[in-house]
Structure formats: C-alpha cells, structure tokens
Amino acid sequence: QSDFSPGAVYDEVVTELEVANVVGMITYQQELDLAALAETFDERDEITDVTYEPADNHWLQTRFAPDDTYVAFYRTGRCSIAGCRSIEHFEPMVGSVNAVMRELLDFEYEPAAEISNIVATSDLGSPIPLELLTLELGMDAVEYEPEQFPALMYRGTNHVILVFASGKLLCTGLTDLEAVSEAVANLGGRIQAVV
C-alpha cells in the first residue's frame, strides 16, 4: 500500500537544490606525455594519488588535495575534473591543476576550462505516484520500468531528471545552476498536476 495522498500539496515546488557533483574539462593546446606526468605527479604533495596503467586505460588518473578531487589527464591535452561539490569548488580546482601544469609544460596561454555537467538533487517533500506521472509526462519523454530501476527517468531537451517515488529528484546534463533550477522547477510544476 502506498503512503501517497491525492490531496498532498507542496508548499514549494523545489525546496532546495543541492549540488552533488560538478564535472568539467580543461584543454591544453598540446599533447601530454602521460608516463612523464605520472612520474612527476608521484613527487607532488598536492597530488594524493596517481594511477597510470596504459595497458588497461588510456588516461592518467589522479586525486588532488585537499579533498581528493578526481582529475584525469588524456594524451590529447584534455583534462577532466570530477567530484567538485560546487561551482565555487570547481574554479579553484582548475587553478590548482593549471598551477601544476604550468610548472611542467611550456605554455603562455590561459587553458580553456568549462563545466560540462552539474549533478544536483532536490526533495519535493512528498511521495510521487510515478505511474500517474508517467501518463502526465507522456511515454515519449519518460522511461519507467520499476522492476529494473526504482526511478522514473524524464528526458528534457538537454538534461535528464530521475524522479523517485519518495519525492527526491536528481538532475544531470546541464552546465549552469540557473538552468538546473529552472528544469527542476518546471518538472516540479508538472508533478503537482498529478498529486
């Protein structure tokens, strides 16, 4: 038996967004010698972990202090940063990575850095009838197979929002917080139509 009440009303569509992960890229305008970087990184205090196994992976995996943020380096000159808990955390991490790379590489330019994905969660505070929501949103925008995965997957234009029966939402695929907030608020409004 469900604890869903058809009369449930949300005080606010979105109570609060919590950023779970910010992912981004830095592009250096040159190829990287990953073996040489791995050797050098092993000696750096600001890098807490270095893994380079070219037989298994084509990238160099590192963790940067102080909070073990994951940073992967690719031979093509790209660098991926994952695990930042906010945009405010991402920007100084880019600075830390660039500071290390400036000491190791010869470049005068400012490497391009951009956020490629923000993962954020929200809690609507009330249970959601996922079967009814599937009908409201339409099968072309929704995947819901409860025997395989406990959430409804809503596909927006350039994002995905997982909707859990508990009222929790997880949004991924967008690159700025305003867009995330707008996407979650829009879906929250449509969820209200079925409760």
Residue map of PLM features:
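Intrinsically disordered, low-complexity polar/charged tails and linkers
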Residues: Q1-S80, C84-I161, S166, L174-V195
